[in-house]
Amino acid sequence: MEIFGNVVSGLGEGRFFVGLTPYKNKFKELTGFTPFEGTLNVKLKHNFNLDEFNPIEFDGFEIDGKKYFGGKVLLVKLFDKSGHSINCAIVAPKKTDHSKKTLELIAPVHLRKFLSLNNSDVVKIVI
């Protein structure tokens, strides 16, 4: 399945959460790569239901009495408008401020730099 969306600025929280060691280790275990500390946000025209694609669920954890929620991850391939691509993953935290129209992607590299992406650029996600 192919999904198209536009690159948008995030809330600035992806870098913090992906950088937490328990999340980083879990993402490496589930995806096969150590994620860059940050996410790429892609805004879709319609709501996206990740559960239709059998994502892998992961549990939350606690650090110094602070609870961090689990979520779901799905391996995908991301393409820029020139056809360049990279394997990455959609991450859907159980607790998020994003709408169901916004996808958060992680990869072993800084996706904006690797694919020379700017806000409003159209990208294709292949599941």
From Swiss-Prot:
CDP binds at residues 10-15, 109-112. It catalyses: riboflavin + CTP = CDP + FMN + H(+). Keywords: Flavoprotein, FMN, Kinase, Magnesium, Metal-binding, Nucleotide-binding, Transferase. Binds 1 Mg(2+) ion per subunit. Catalyzes the CTP-dependent phosphorylation of riboflavin (vitamin B2) to form flavin mononucleotide (FMN). GO terms for biological process: FMN biosynthetic process; riboflavin biosynthetic process. Its EC number is 2.7.1.161. FMN binds at residues 96, 104. Mg(2+) binds at residues 39, 41. Pfam families: CTP-dep_RFKase. Belongs to the archaeal riboflavin kinase family. Pathway: Cofactor biosynthesis; FMN biosynthesis; FMN from riboflavin (CTP route): step 1/1. InterPro entries: Archaeal_Riboflavin_Kinase, RibK_CTP-dep, Riboflavin_kinase_archaeal, Riboflavin_kinase_CTP-dep, Riboflavin_kinase_dom_sf. Gene3D superfamilies: Riboflavin kinase-like. This is Riboflavin kinase. The lineage of its organism: Archaea, Methanobacteriati, Methanobacteriota, Methanomada group, Methanococci. GO terms for molecular function: magnesium ion binding; nucleotide binding; riboflavin kinase activity. It comes from Methanococcus maripaludis (strain C7 / ATCC BAA-1331). Its cofactor is Mg(2+).
